[in-house]
C-alpha cells in the first residue's frame, strides 16, 4: 500500500484482523484472510465533524468509494473491499452520526454530499485520471445519487446495491414503511444495556430476514455497538431519525432520480428483496 495522508489527523496502516477480537468466536479462514489485507485508517474533518475512514490498495489505481446503509458503518465493507483492492484504490467511510464518525446537530442530504466529496478529495481518489466509482448500499444510494446528480464530472459512475425503488403507490400501501428513517419525530436517547450480550439481542437485520451468515451478523453487531456508561449502547446518533431525507419523503422521488441522473449506472439487488420488486 502506498501511504497517503492529506488530512491533518494522523493515519495508521494496519490490518483489520483485530476487528474480529470479541466479535466472532470462530471466524472462517476466508474472513480472516480478507481482514488480514493491510488498510489505512484515519479521520478527516468535514464542516467541523470528524469523519472516520478506511483505505485499501494502491492510490495509483482507479478509485472506488463505498457508502454504507442507514445506521450502519464502513466495516460493512471491511471483508469485501480487500478483494477489490487487488485492482482498485478503495475507500469506505462512516457517515457522520454513524460508526466511528462524529455527530452533528442535523443531517441534511447536502452535508452527506459534502462528506462524500471531501473524503474522495482528501484520500486521493480524485488524483487518478479516472474518476472514482461510487458503490452505494441502501441509504447510501440516496447520498450517491445526490452527489453524482450535482457533481457528475467528479465520478465515473455509480453502482447501487439494494436501494428501495418502489412506485409511490406501492410505498403508500405499505404501512411498515412509515417507520423508515426520517419518518419519526423527536430525538430519542439510545438505551444503555447492562452488557454486550443484552445489547446484541436487540441487533436485527432490516428488512427482517433469516441470518444466513452468522459470523458476518456477529461482526456487524459488535461494530454497531460501543461501551458507554458502564454498559453497551448503539454507536449511531439518535438524531438521525430526523434526517431531511425522510421529512420531505425523499424515498418517493428515488425511482425518478435513478432514471434522470446522467451518469453510468448499475443496480444490484437481492433476488428475494422486499425493497426492489419485479415491478421496480
Locate the predicted segments by residue.
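A catalytic-pocket lid/entrance helix-loop region that shapes and gates access to the active site
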Residues: 161-194
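Conserved alpha/beta-hydrolase catalytic His-Asp/Glu region
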Residues: 188-248
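Alpha/beta-hydrolase fold catalytic core
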Residues: 1-64, 86-88, 125-129
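Conserved serine/cysteine hydrolase catalytic core
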Residues: 226-280
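Active-site loop/oxyanion-hole signature of alpha/beta-hydrolase fold enzymes
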Residues: 46-49, 54, 92-135
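Conserved HGGG/HGGXW glycine-rich cap/lid loop of the alpha/beta-hydrolase fold
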Residues: 49-100
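Conserved hydrolase catalytic core segment
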Residues: 87, 129-173
